């Protein structure tokens, strides 16, 4: 299912993990991929001719919007993947106000701003907004209250946005991954189990994105939950 190369896909949090895997998948599918990340030096980033890493902190709204204007001036944007995320774990009273603000801005505010900046273009191109949420959006999340709340807010935004924009051909999809082998949990006191069946890989989420894009025009799956076969986590 190869797309015309000039169609653009924008992916946040693209320097590693899920965002990196999605960027590589979209590159193979023929999109002109613009991946936003804070540090591509530490990542095993493999840039093809149609993959463009952009060093930018998504919390720098002015810089982010400037890049978006430059991209949309040269390419029809077909896909936006809001993937950048950050998690802080522990008792809620032990989170600082600054950490709570950063978490909400990264996981919820920035996706809403990026979508606002690109929505007119996505309507014109009958494009996709793919939001990477979390299974914690749909369940109790003790020791991760703020993270779960922000991801639940992202899911709510997705559902309302789809109802608002569907008549223009815009597809809005939320992916809810369970524990995935990424750096997201580096601040947590737990990690995935040792068995390969106890966690997801970033490539699993990228595969879900490919499946979303493979559906015929007129069909949209709005929510996808990905879970490992075995539920097992380990304390660090």
Residue positions per predicted region:
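Conserved glycine-rich cofactor-binding loop
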Residues: 15-16
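Conserved glycine-rich Rossmann-like NAD(P)H-binding loop of the short-chain dehydrogenase/reductase
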Residues: 29-45
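Substrate-binding pocket helix/loop in short-chain dehydrogenase/reductase
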Residues: 91-92, 99-104
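Active-site helix of classical SDR
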Residues: 115, 150
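Alpha-helical segment proximal to the catalytic Tyr-Lys
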Residues: 120, 159, 163-167
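Residue(s) in the substrate-gating loop at a strand-loop-helix junction
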Residues: 134
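C-terminal helical subdomain
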Residues: 174, 192-234
């Amino acid at each position: 299912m190869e797309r015309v190369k000039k169609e653009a896909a924008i992916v946040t949090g693209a320097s590693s993990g899920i965002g990196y895997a999605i960027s590589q998948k979209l590159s193979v599918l023929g999109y002109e991929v613009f991946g936003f990340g804070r540090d591509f030096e530490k990542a095993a980033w493999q840039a093809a001719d149609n993959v463009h890493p952009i060093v930018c902190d998504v919390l720098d709204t002015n810089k982010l919007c400037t890049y978006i204007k430059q991209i949309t001036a040269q390419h029809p944007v077909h896909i936006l993947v809001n993937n950048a995320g950050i998690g802080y774990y522990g008792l809620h009273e032990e989170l600082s106000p600054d950490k709570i603000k950063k978490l909400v801005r990264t996981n919820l505010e920035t996706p809403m701003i990026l979508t606002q900046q690109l929505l007119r273009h996505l309507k014109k191109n009958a494009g996709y907004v793919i939001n990477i949420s979390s299974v914690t959006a749909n369940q109790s999340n003790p020791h991760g209250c703020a993270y779960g709340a922000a991801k639940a807010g992202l899911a709510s935004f997705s559902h309302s946005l789809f109802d608002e924009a569907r008549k223009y051909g815009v597809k809005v999809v939320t992916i809810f991954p369970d524990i995935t082998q990424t750096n997201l949990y580096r601040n947590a006191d737990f990690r995935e189990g040792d068995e390969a069946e106890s966690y997801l890989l970033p490539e699993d989420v990228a595969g879900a994105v490919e499946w979303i894009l493979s559906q015929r025009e007129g069909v949209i799956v709005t929510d996808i939950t990905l879970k490992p076969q075995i539920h097992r986590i380990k304390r660090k």
